[in-house]
Swiss-Prot record:
It catalyses: 4 Fe(II)-[cytochrome c] + O2 + 8 H(+)(in) = 4 Fe(III)-[cytochrome c] + 2 H2O + 4 H(+)(out). InterPro entries: CcO_II, CcO_II-like_C, CcO_II_C, Copper_CuA, Cupredoxin, Cyt_c_oxidase_su2, Cyt_c_oxidase_su2_TM_dom, Cyt_c_oxidase_su2_TM_sf. Its EC number is 7.1.1.9. One of its GO terms (molecular function) is cytochrome-c oxidase activity. Cu cation A1 binds at residues 161, 196, 200, 207. Binds a dinuclear copper A center per subunit. Residues 46-59 are mitochondrial matrix. It comes from Pongo pygmaeus. This is Cytochrome c oxidase subunit 2. Pfam families: COX2, COX2_TM. It comes from the Eukaryota. Cu cation A2 binds at residues 196, 198, 200, 204.
Length: 227
């Protein structure tokens, strides 16, 4: 989960997020290398006294500054495309949950477990208990099992929303009249927080998402659905 004054990414809780963290470090290394080369070239240009104004052709240099950017783009694009296809892959989910965005709360439907439906509202400051997070905790959490593929069907009843949980590497738009889907497999139990990531009106900042991930054996016992 996130911490105060956190600079880096949140701890990965799914294979997709682990891939995203690795790709982030990979792309950042390439960017640092490009910046270093550009600054080094500028430094040499400003400090050298060896100049030649009669050069009209530099075939080798033109080849290098055409080929090198193409190679760099390929090194960035290939891992990115791989992750993009992984995020769209549907791996025989164990069960399906439907999430419906409203102004400004979420509705969840456990269609595979007796059609359980409930709303999830942000807890007002007066109802927070010690240890709860302001603007992030909700009255009804989404309880999910770890190490089981889950398919989340996402839509909206009014305006554009976006169902986002950074620790799982999830961000899927909720669009009225359209049903989007995403799959994920959590690897660690715990409580993980997200928020609507699409500006959806005056209370856009007040529709958090809370996932409580528990072992599969406990999840299948049933009482976890007592909200």
């Amino acid at each position: 989960m996130a911490h105060r004054a956190q600079v880096g990414l949140q701890d990965a809780t799914s294979p997709i997020m682990e891939e995203l963290v690795i790709f982030h470090d990979h792309a950042l290394m390439i960017i640092f290398l490009i910046c270093f080369l550009v600054l080094y070239a500028l430094f040499l240009t400003l400090t050298t006294k060896l100049t030649n104004t009669n050069i009209s052709d530099a075939q080798e240099m033109e080849t290098i500054w055409t080929t090198l950017p193409a190679i760099i783009l390929i090194l960035i694009a290939l891992p990115s495309l791989r992750i993009l296809y992984l995020t769209d892959e549907i791996n025989d989910p164990s069960f399906t949950i439907k999430s419906i965005g409203h102004q400004w709360y979420w509705t969840y439907e456990y269609t595979d477990y007796g059609g359980l439906i409930f709303n999830s509202y942000m807890l007002p400051p007066l109802f927070l208990e010690p240890g709860d997070l302001r603007l992030l905790d909700v009255d009804n959490r989404v309880v999910l099992p770890v190490e089981a593929p889950v398919r989340m069907m996402i839509t909206s009843q009014d305006v554009l929303h976006s169902w986002t949980v950074p620790s799982l590497g999830l961000k899927t738009d909720a669009i009225p009249g359209r049903l989007n889907q995403t799959t994920f497999t959590a690897t660690r139990p715990g409580v993980y927080y997200g928020q609507c990531s699409e500006i959806c009106g005056a209370n856009h900042s007040f529709m958090p998402i809370v996932l409580e991930l528990i072992p599969l054996k406990i999840f299948e016992m049933g009482p976890v659905f007592a909200l």
